């Protein structure tokens, strides 16, 4: 007996596959208990940071991940699941989740960041990393400090009258 494939599910599969194409950072959230307004606000904040949020069916998501040869994420696909992808700085998107966790019922399940599976604990630590701009700024201040000290020392020496 041949099992007919529901065209709606095929469409969902293709849509989700396209949603994940070219994305190195995928996060899984449990949105149970969030109001529509809270979920809309979360989606808006994620989009502001060049990310995207989509509520998914777990079985279809499992098939898409299998199709993309991504393993180790099945444990995050239980219960209501929202998938978030990050186009640029994934840790900025993760920070948004943890801001929402403080004030709502949102739960972070885990993720897939640059080819590695991250559990909730790892994602929490990842969310605390500085952004690319903050890292560059910190690096520049480290480089600038010795030069500033040298300039002040030379200035002090030139101010001393012999």
Curated annotation (Swiss-Prot):
Pfam families referenced in this protein's UniProt entry, alphabetically: Ribosomal_L10
Residues forming coiled coils: none
Signal peptide region: none
One of the record's GO molecular function terms: large ribosomal subunit rRNA binding
Keywords from the UniProt entry: Ribonucleoprotein, Ribosomal protein, RNA-binding, rRNA-binding
One BP term from GO: translation
Assembly mode: Part of the ribosomal stalk of the 50S ribosomal subunit. The N-terminus interacts with L11 and the large rRNA to form the base of the stalk. The C-terminus forms an elongated spine to which L12 dimers bind in a sequential fashion forming a multimeric L10(L12)X complex.
UniProt-listed HAMAP family: Ribosomal_uL10 (MF_00362)
UniProt xrefs under PANTHER family: 39S RIBOSOMAL PROTEIN L10, MITOCHONDRIAL (PTHR11560)
UniProt-recorded name of the protein: Large ribosomal subunit protein uL10
Species of the source: Borrelia duttonii (strain Ly)
Recorded name of the encoding gene: rplJ
